[in-house]
Regions:
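N-terminal binding-site loop/beta-alpha segment at the start of enzyme catalytic domains
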Residues: 1-68, 186
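Conserved, mostly hydrophobic/aromatic
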Residues: 17, 42, 54, 70, ...
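Active-site-proximal loop/turn and secondary-structure-junction residues that shape catalytic pockets
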Residues: 21, 46-48, 74-76, 109, ...
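Glycine/proline-rich, positively charged
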Residues: 79-153, 157-160, 178
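Charged helix-capping and loop-helix junction motifs
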Residues: 85-88, 113-118, 169-170, 192-200
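His/Asp/Glu-enriched short active-site or ligand-binding loop at hydrolase and phosphoryl-transfer sites
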Residues: 156-161, 177-192
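Anionic-ligand binding region
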Residues: 165-173
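Conserved small/polar residues in nucleotide/adenosyl-binding loops
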Residues: 204-206
């Protein structure tokens, strides 16, 4: 699978399998099936309430851990330096792993600076390979980049063919080559994206 190189040299698969809104009790099997068809990036979050099931899938698969890129996100109730550090340890336990490939701050509210400092320190300690944010607009991204010593590797935001956010892309590149990662790149299947004639023709000619 194609990868992108983050600004700290870590390789991230271009395509990830997100586990948001998978019904309780079905996440383990969904992740195993995703891995079986070739996905190597699994994206979860503390607020999804399914980290433990993702961990069960990672424990059950025969694919080595170092071949799987694992993302989770810190929820608002765990913001602040100490709370974030403690929540990462809890996520590691649920996910049955001793390191995380990418950890993001899920929303741009609350004590983002204290939380990001905690992620940076955990990155230095080797428990996280890459750190970043999610749902930060250009102004909030500029704040976190300007007032933190550690570089931001990723900003995961909503991007799809109907909402391309070209200015955000340019701004992220200017802020230390932060990678913009799309959530819901297929617009959650809405707006006729899979039957759109222009998009269908584009796929035919790729």
């Amino acid at each position: 699978m194609q990868t992108f190189t983050l600004n700290n040299g870590v390789e991230i698969p271009a395509l990830g399998f997100g586990v948001f809104q998978i019904p309780q009790g079905q996440t383990k099997q969904a992740v195993l099936e995703a891995l079986n068809v070739g996905y190597r990036h699994i994206d979860t979050a503390q607020s999804y309430m399914n980290e433990a099931e993702v961990g069960e899938a990672l424990a059950a698969t025969k694919i080595p851990r170092d071949k799987i890129f694992l993302t989770t996100k810190i929820w608002l109730s765990n913001y602040g330096y100490e709370a974030t550090a403690k929540s990462v340890e809890a996520s590691l336990t649920k996910l049955q792993t001793d390191y995380l490939d990418l950890v993001l701050l899920h929303q741009p509210y609350g004590d983002v600076f204290g939380s990001f400092k905690a992620l940076a320190d955990l990155q230095k300690a080797g428990k996280i390979r890459a750190i970043g944010v999610s749902n930060f607009n250009s102004e909030r991204l500029a704040d976190i980049v300007a007032f933190q010593d550690a570089p931001v590797q990723v900003n995961q935001i909503e991007i799809n063919p109907f909402y391309q956010r070209e200015q955000d892309l340019m701004n992220a590149k200017a802020r230390g080559h932060v990678l913009l990662e799309a959530w819901a790149p297929f617009a959650e299947g809405k707006d006729g994206i899979f039957s759109n004639k222009t998009l269908t023709l584009s796929l035919i000619h790729i």
